[in-house]
Amino acid sequence: MSRSIRNQDVPELPRRRQVRTVGMSGNYWYVVEIDGRLKPRQVKRVRFWGQDIALFRDAAGELHAVEDRCPHRQLPLSQGFVEGGNLVCTYHGWKFDGCGRCTEIHHELGKGRTRLPRIRIRTYPVKAQWGLIWLFPGDPALADGTPLPTIPQLEGGRPWPFFPIDVTIKAHFSMIVENVCDFNHEYLHRHKRPFLQPILREWKQDADSVRVYYDTRFDGSPVAKLFMEGGARDLNEIEIWYQYPYQGSDIGGKYIHWLFMLPEDERTTRCFFVFLFGPIHVPIVNWKMPEFLRKPILWFTNKWYIEPLLGEDKWALELEQDGFERHPDAPQIELNPAISSFQRLSLEKWKAYQQSMERAGPKPAADPA
């Protein structure tokens, strides 16, 4: 479906309250951590829509993800430690391997037993790609057949360098989708000026994505003036997508961003931003930046400009979440007709996921091995 914004009525959004409570489908790969932050023999707790998961690397550096709950006394396994290939509960010393099996019990009632308790905690498919750790929280049988997003700039012999930005926002993921896809909040960034005078040209929706197209200017930001080719004066449009459950944008094939959201609960979303810069130029002379300077410049740009810019969105979104909780039944006047498409897609995907779980039936937290 493709629609122009011409002659469109301002839509009513009766689904607003509903979309602020749904989760995301577990049958996709989600970024749960930056790869370099989890060293061998380390364990961390991550969360997907109320599911606490212990993410750890064994002594050999292999990734594992298990339910963050020792079946003995229900303590979080993420409070324990890694020993060899096992995750050890810090309370009684019960050990679990990466397949979720109990491999050893430390105390005298467990030592020397020829048969350990036949229990197995839930495990999750997990892998590292592009410097990010991805986890599949849904039906594990679907993991191998579910692809990661296609990012050609990160493939091949010379992938574009980047430094991922990790931001936790105390807001529902649907608010974040609307924020990053709706350029009508230009006023919030009136001092940093990342885009100017945006005009929504059209939007398209299919079963898995919504794409919006804006005419806008990018030559107002200091990053554009300093490092973008020609000060970005020849760039005047952007394509933005909500390719469920991922979000991203493309400015002329030269400057691209991806947002990988990890919905922790109804009011908390961990966001992993990836900003990909193609041509970067030396200020004033407008020469192509030498390769050895690209990474330092990208790191500097993140710290000096992009992270403070995202901080403005975080501030506004957390206030929006607070306002929604205080006034959940207040009518919302929405002028951007594409917003209803984002909300509809989130609702449809969540409904389909719930139906798939109902067909599969309930699964016990700890199954017989």
Curated annotation (Swiss-Prot):
Pfam families: Rieske (PF00355), VanA_C (PF19112). Its cofactor is [2Fe-2S] cluster. GO terms for molecular function: 2 iron, 2 sulfur cluster binding; metal ion binding; monooxygenase activity. InterPro entries: Cholesterol_7-desaturase, Rieske_2Fe-2S, Rieske_2Fe-2S_sf, VanA_C_cat. Its EC number is 1.14.13.246. Participates in the biosynthesis of bacterial sterols. SdmA oxidizes the sterol 4beta-methyl group into first a hydroxyl, then an aldehyde and finally a carboxylic acid group. This is 4beta-methylsterol monooxygenase. The lineage of its organism: Bacteria, Pseudomonadati, Pseudomonadota, Gammaproteobacteria, Methylococcales. The gene is sdmA.
